[in-house]
């Protein structure tokens, strides 16, 4: 899938400027103008904040270094961070989702499964990175846990960012170049090390963004976009780094989108006896039959059932 950004909304007059949202903190947004000028802080018009990092926007200058967002361009997709009480959009116009795992500490398969469902539901290419392959005592165990995901067709890239940084950089760039990629990872997996490997001035950029957004010392509490260096053929791409893996929710997804977000379910869905089968306890359910005979892992079906339950608790 192409990593090219969607077409930006047209700026109708000289007082309006097009740009890309590169960071967000509350109702504060940092926008990089299309003309290559200095980034400036922007605010949405009105009380509601419907802007996400990765959005193409049009803003009106309110002062030399501030603007008001007046238009949001057409989106390829939109990802949410959600809990039982609310959903908040946080990233837009992606085409890939990268999950950073490690041989140690022990990674959560529940969180991995949720990330893969989010990728499938938003038509993003999922990419699993297994870091710390130098920890040989834990390597085979981690590989064994990831084997079912490889069997589903998911790409797993093995790296040792700390011990073999250049090899890791080459392996990662091959998959990231030309794509807009959301980066997710639990604490301790090496996500920050990965960002610093690929974006040498990431820490400096983070401090500058934090200052521009008036977020002070809370440098890890905002979503931000880092442009990737251009390759020889001129294709760069972007990394979108967002904190709070555990908060990454799926409550806004309908049951229909959830069932199709499990690739092993999709070929079996037409075989259910009832067209509105929930795949939980219905007779003649092709999914439950596949779980019973081992074609679908019980853990994957349990995740589906849990996500259906969580979605049912939301007042829509």
Swiss-Prot record:
Listed cofactors: Zn(2+)
Q: Which domain of life is it from?
A: Bacteria
Localization of this protein: Cytoplasm
Which InterPro entries does this one have? G_CP_dom (IPR030378), NA-bd_OB-fold (IPR012340), P-loop_NTPase (IPR027417), Ribosome_biogen_GTPase_RsgA (IPR004881), RsgA_GTPase_dom (IPR010914), RsgA_N (IPR031944)
Q: Does the keyword Cytoplasm apply?
A: yes
Among CDD domains, the record links this protein to: S1_YloQ_GTPase, YjeQ_EngC
Annotated disulfide bonds:
none
Residues binding Zn(2+), per UniProt: 272, 277, 279, 285
GO MF assignments: GTP binding; GTPase activity; metal ion binding; rRNA binding
Q: Which residues bind GTP?
A: 131-134, 185-193
Query: What Pfam families does the annotation carry?
Result: RsgA_GTPase (PF03193)
Ranges for domain CP-type G = 83-248
Which keywords annotate this record?
Cytoplasm, GTP-binding, Hydrolase, Metal-binding, Nucleotide-binding, Ribosome biogenesis, RNA-binding, rRNA-binding, Zinc
GO cellular component assignments: cytoplasm
Q: Which GO terms describe its biological process?
A: ribosomal small subunit biogenesis
Free-text comment on the cofactor: Binds 1 zinc ion per subunit.
Q: Note whether GTP-binding occurs among the keywords.
A: yes
Predominant location of this chain?
Answer: cytoplasm
Per the UniProt record, which EC number(s) apply here?
A: 3.6.1.-
Q: Which family does it belong to?
A: Belongs to the TRAFAC class YlqF/YawG GTPase family. RsgA subfamily.
Its quaternary organisation is:
Monomer. Associates with 30S ribosomal subunit, binds 16S rRNA.
Role summary: One of several proteins that assist in the late maturation steps of the functional core of the 30S ribosomal subunit. Helps release RbfA from mature subunits. May play a role in the assembly of ribosomal proteins into the subunit. Circularly permuted GTPase that catalyzes slow GTP hydrolysis, GTPase activity is stimulated by the 30S ribosomal subunit.
Q: Which HAMAP family match?
A: GTPase_RsgA (MF_01820)
Q: What is this protein called?
A: Small ribosomal subunit biogenesis GTPase RsgA
Its source organism is: Paraburkholderia phytofirmans (strain DSM 17436 / LMG 22146 / PsJN) (Burkholderia phytofirmans)
Its taxonomic placement starts with: Bacteria, Pseudomonadati, Pseudomonadota, Betaproteobacteria, Burkholderiales
**Which gene does this sequence derive from?**
rsgA
């Amino acid at each position: 899938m192409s990593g090219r950004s969607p077409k930006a909304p047209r700026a109708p007059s000289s007082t309006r400027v097009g740009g890309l949202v590169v960071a967000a903190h509350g109702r504060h947004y940092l926008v990089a103008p299309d003309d290559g000028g200095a980034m400036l802080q922007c605010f949405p018009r009105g009380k509601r904040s419907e802007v996400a990092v990765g959005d193409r926007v049009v803003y009106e200058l309110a002062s030399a270094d501030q603007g008001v967002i007046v238009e949001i361009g057409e989106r390829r997709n939109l990802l949410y961070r959600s809990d039982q009480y609310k959903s908040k959009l946080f990233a837009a116009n992606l085409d890939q989702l990268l999950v950073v795992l490690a041989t140690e500490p022990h990674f959560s398969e529940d969180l991995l499964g949720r990330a893969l469902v989010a990728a499938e539901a938003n038509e993003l290419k999922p990419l699993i990175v297994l870091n710390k392959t130098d920890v040989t005592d834990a390597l085979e165990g981690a590989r064994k846990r990831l084997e079912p995901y490889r069997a589903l067709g998911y790409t797993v890239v093995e790296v040792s960012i700390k011990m073999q940084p250049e090899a890791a950089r080459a392996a990662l760039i091959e998959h990231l170049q030309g794509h807009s990629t959301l980066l997710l990872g639990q604490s301790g997996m090496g996500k920050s090390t990965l960002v610093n490997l690929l974006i040498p001035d990431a820490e400096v950029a983070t401090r500058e963004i934090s200052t521009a957004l008036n977020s002070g010392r809370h440098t890890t509490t905002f979503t931000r976009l880092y442009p990737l260096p251009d390759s020889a053929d001129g294709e760069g791409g972007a990394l979108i780094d967002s904190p709070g893996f555990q908060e990454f929710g799926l409550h806004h997804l309908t049951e229909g989108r959830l069932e199709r977000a499990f690739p092993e379910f999709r070929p079996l869905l037409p075989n259910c006896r009832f067209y509105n089968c929930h795949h939980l306890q219905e007779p003649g359910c092709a999914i439950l039959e596949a779980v019973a005979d081992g074609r679908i892992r019980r853990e994957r079906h349990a995740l589906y059932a849990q996500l259906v339950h969580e979605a049912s608790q939301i007042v829509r």
